[in-house]
Amino acid sequence: TAFSIANDIIRNAHNEAHGAYNGIALIKLMGRDSGFIAANAVLAIQEVNFVLIPEISFDLYGPGGFLAALKKRLEERHHAVVVVAEGAGQDLFESLTGEKDASGNIKHQDIGIFLKEKIKAEFKALGFPFSLKYIDPSYIIRSAPANANDSKFCNLLAQNAVHAAMAGKTDFVIGFWNNQFTLMPIAAVVAKRKKIDVEGELWWNVLEATGQPISMKNS
């Protein structure tokens, strides 16, 4: 459901970017530590040119950096759509406070506003014409009612949880592996955060969809 809603937002953003000379649409999506929403939304619409996720660091400046790649895209096609997960690019900030929210998560700096200002400053300094629109849908993408597929899946999770509890099982969550519902120990589930495998099929599919460089680092 979340990336279906994000898909509609990206589609509208693409229309906005395409309607202006050297138009840039910059969309920030949820994803504190993993870029799954951004990656899946991009694959669903196939209109995004750059995806920035927490799993992969990038440089802003220099011939191999993001701004140079964005400028090249605009010179060739005169519009660009950029999707950034909220946890991407945190290493670009000069100071990190380490402050935590009520849930104990480290508060990230706002990469969306940061990129918006850096893009504007760089292209203005170069005298390069552009039009930039920044979109932050925030919680909109996860506050929508679940679609039919997600509703069905959640009902099946609940049914399996009740069956397991009635059988005397405890300290578990319901998983889904190889088209089978499974019982996973809570300790195993929370031991490690799930992240995109940047050498795996999902990320390579994203690279093929966007056409962005494999790396946006200068070295």
Name each model feature, range by range:
Residues 99-219:
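C-terminal non-catalytic interaction/assembly regions of soluble proteins
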